[in-house]
Swiss-Prot record:
Keyword Ligase: no
Protein name as catalogued: Hydroxyethylthiazole kinase
A molecular-function term among this protein's GO annotations: ATP binding
Function according to Swiss-Prot or TrEMBL: Catalyzes the phosphorylation of the hydroxyl group of 4-methyl-5-beta-hydroxyethylthiazole (THZ).
Cofactor(s) named in the record: Mg(2+)
Binding sites annotated in the UniProt record for substrate: 39, 186
High-level lineage: Bacteria, Bacillati, Bacillota, Bacilli, Bacillales
Residues engaged in binding ATP: 115, 159
Gene3D superfamilies referenced in this protein's UniProt entry, alphabetically: 3.40.1190.20
EC number annotated for this UniProt entry: 2.7.1.50
Protein family per UniProt: Belongs to the Thz kinase family.
Organism: Macrococcus caseolyticus (strain JCSC5402) (Macrococcoides caseolyticum)
Pathway as given in its UniProt record: Cofactor biosynthesis; thiamine diphosphate biosynthesis; 4-methyl-5-(2-phosphoethyl)-thiazole from 5-(2-hydroxyethyl)-4-methylthiazole: step 1/1
């Protein structure tokens, strides 16, 4: 686990096409971590942005019909410039509109990572439907990650009480985290952007690298929950930004609770 220091040194440009509700929170989180976010969406400038980018996040949280072509064009330019893409299929099990778009994106372009909760990933693999953006807590992140990897043959991050990461048919579980992440909007969306920041310039990131990304974020979240007034949602959100700024490489090795299965 050695990428955090390099990330802060390189300050990679991360293009975030993301949920309108979380743009400010996401940008501040990446700045605190050490990345350089750009919340660009205009297709006329996307080729120029992605020529210099380290990664692209596509988050469909507030997708509308007019957003589809922008996202597809951005994915095409990212593939052209060998820029890794993280797809966050927010609430893709809640409507055919969302699910069909995600499947089209996955079919037409190379996506390096799919990051979703268990319900979202189960919906993509035709195993479940969902209500809104909330995860079905009865679903196993490990089994959902395996099924999604088998279907899409790309790295999968299934988030929940225990986060499961699948790459090259290997699974790593990350047990860090806090329920407070479900009490503020954007907790999962920011995680997708953090993952994009860690995998800059890596179109096929290793299991170890993905594990470091998840551990960094979830340890910061644990620390935020234990900071002053961290059990209050408003304070927790601010604390999380602070802890992403404060966390150090050595903290990840000392505090991570991970296991391979």
């Amino acid at each position: 686990m050695v990428k955090l220091n390099q990330l802060r040194k390189d300050n990679p440009l991360i293009i975030c096409i993301t949920n309108d509700v979380v743009k400010n929170f996401t940008a501040n989180g990446l700045l605190a971590l050490g990345a350089s976010p750009a919340m660009a969406t205009e297709r006329q400038e996307m080729d120029e942005f992605l020529a210099h980018a380290g990664a692209l996040l596509i988050n469909i949280g507030s997708i509308e019909e007019g957003d589809k072509e922008n996202m597809l064009q951005a994915a095409a330019f990212a593939n052209k410039h060998h820029v890794p893409i993280v797809l966050d299929p927010v609430a893709c099990g809640a409507s055919k509109f969302r699910k069909d778009f995600c499947l089209r994106l996955l079919n037409e372009h190379h996506i390096s990572i799919i990051r979703g909760n268990a319900s979202e990933l189960a919906a993509l693999t035709d195993d479940a439907t969902m209500k809104g953006t909330d995860a079905d807590q009865s679903l196993s992140t490990e089994s959902v990650a395996r099924r999604a990897y088998d279907k899409f043959k790309t790295a999968i991050i299934a988030t929940g009480a225990v986060d499961a990461i699948c790459q090259d048919e290997q699974i790593m579980l990350v047990e860090n985290g806090t329920p407070m992440l479900t009490k503020v909007t954007g907790g999962g969306c920011l995680l997708g952007a953090v993952v994009a920041s860690f995998i800059y310039n890596e179109t096929k990131p290793s299991l170890a690298l993905l594990t470091e990304a998840i551990a960094t974020y979830t340890i910061a979240a644990e620390r935020a929950a234990h900071s002053a007034n961290g059990t209050l949602p408003g304070h927790f959100a601010v604390n999380l930004i602070d802890q992403l700024y404060l966390i150090q490489q050595d903290d990840i090795a000392k505090e991570s609770r991970v296991k391979e299965v």
